[in-house]
Amino acid sequence: MNQENFIRRYFIIGERRFSNYWWATVILIGSFGFLLTGISSYISTSLNSTALSSNIESQMQLPFFLSMLKNSNSTGAINFFPQGLLMCFYGSLGFLLSIYWWCLIFWNVGGGFNEFNKKENFIRIFRWGYPGKNRKIDLYYTLKDVESIRVEILQGFDSQRTIFLKLKGNREIPITGIGQPLTLQEIEKQASELANFLQVSLEGL
């Protein structure tokens, strides 16, 4: 028998999904747009409200972009208060959210693998967590601790499809990824293959 007959390993993507890359990028670009709009409204409002602005212009030439901002404010550009201030506020929130999202992607929170090893008689559940004490979540169980494989399917707006590893002592360990539910066919196939491989019963289907 080859290696595949003794060892099964299922990889969990975690936060490094295409959808997370997409939304983190979109939010980052959008937040920069809001911040630049708010900052430009502050600069243009300041230039127009400062009594010395005309004297400064007469003595030295303003940079091109400052002159454009000053002129744009007189032609209907937004004021810093309250529109520009709100733009800065929402832009800052979006920027912080995008940075947090990129950190999750970099750390790959929730990513890892499930290994079922008949050759050495163990099950290994590995996940990456947040930086700190629990950065690595590495759990080991023996094959004889497994009683069955249970599938839980919750339908609705936020549908969830989860495979649980039922262990002795009424313990249940979820072994599917979070945030990207598998299709019903994929759940059935993976659960059936795993139950056959471990030679335990399958519950929930």
UniProtKB/Swiss-Prot annotation:
Subcellular location(s) of the protein: Plastid, Chloroplast thylakoid membrane
Membrane-spanning segments: 23-43, 86-106
Principal localisation: plastid
Top-level lineage group: Eukaryota
Designated name of the protein: Photosystem I assembly protein Ycf4
Pfam families, per the entry: Ycf4 (PF02392)
Entry keyword DNA repair: no
Keyword Transmembrane helix found: yes
Annotated function: Seems to be required for the assembly of the photosystem I complex.
InterPro entries: PSI_Ycf4_assembly
Family in the record: Belongs to the Ycf4 family.
GO terms under biological process: photosynthesis
Membrane topology (UniProt): Multi-pass membrane protein
Record keywords, A-Z: Chloroplast, Membrane, Photosynthesis, Plastid, Thylakoid, Transmembrane, Transmembrane helix
Gene (name only): ycf4
One GO cellular component term noted in the UniProt record for this chain: photosystem I
